[in-house]
């Protein structure tokens, strides 16, 4: 019975957090009440979905940005979890799947589906998300975009054997 009450409470808090303003205040507090471990100075965008059944399996470090409509799915059949380390950026509509660690300062681009861990200071893109660049500066709330873009170093793509 207590488990059912907790599940109902978690879903109600998720629904409220999904719609209310307060990316750095109210949403963060609501998700903490659900059991998500959230560091300091975290920004959670509008309509972000953090695992509805096992929010306690999600850990978010300091200075993380989770953009609008991102989804963090922390488990399928067993406790696996998601860890987002400090200074990471999760782009709009990105999906983070279970048993993944997003490294310090990593960037997940918009719409990417992350099914394996991301190295620190790495930019990933696509479905499934693949590394496309390294970055010398974390993409934070106050980061100058020009400075971030200048710090990017594209990764070499493996040869496909095709001629252009």
Question: Where would I find each of the regions flagged by the language model?
Answer:
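C-terminal segments of enzyme domains that contribute to small-molecule binding surfaces
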Residues: 79-90, 95-96, 127-164
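Extended, small-residue-rich solenoid/repeat segments and analogous flexible loops
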Residues: 2-50
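Structural signal for interior beta-strand "rungs" in well-ordered beta-sheet cores
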Residues: 31-32, 36-38, 42-125, 129-131
């Amino acid at each position: 019975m207590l488990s059912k009450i907790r599940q109902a409470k978690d879903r109600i808090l998720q629904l409220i957090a999904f719609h209310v303003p307060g990316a750095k205040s109210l949403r963060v507090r609501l998700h903490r009440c659900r059991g998500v471990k959230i560091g300091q100075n975290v920004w959670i965008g509008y309509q972000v979905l953090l695992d509805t059944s096992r929010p306690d399996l999600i850990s978010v470090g300091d200075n993380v940005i989770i953009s609008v409509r991102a989804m963090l799915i922390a488990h399928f059949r067993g406790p696996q979890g998601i860890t987002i380390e400090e200074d990471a950026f999760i782009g709009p509509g990105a999906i983070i799947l279970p048993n993944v660690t997003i490294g310090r300062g990593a960037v997940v681009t918009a719409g990417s589906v992350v099914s394996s861990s991301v190295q620190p200071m790495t930019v990933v893109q696509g479905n499934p998300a693949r590394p496309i660049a390294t970055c010398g500066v974390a993409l934070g709330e106050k980061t100058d975009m020009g400075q971030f873009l200048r710090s990017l170093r594209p990764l070499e793509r493996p040869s496909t054997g095709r001629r252009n």
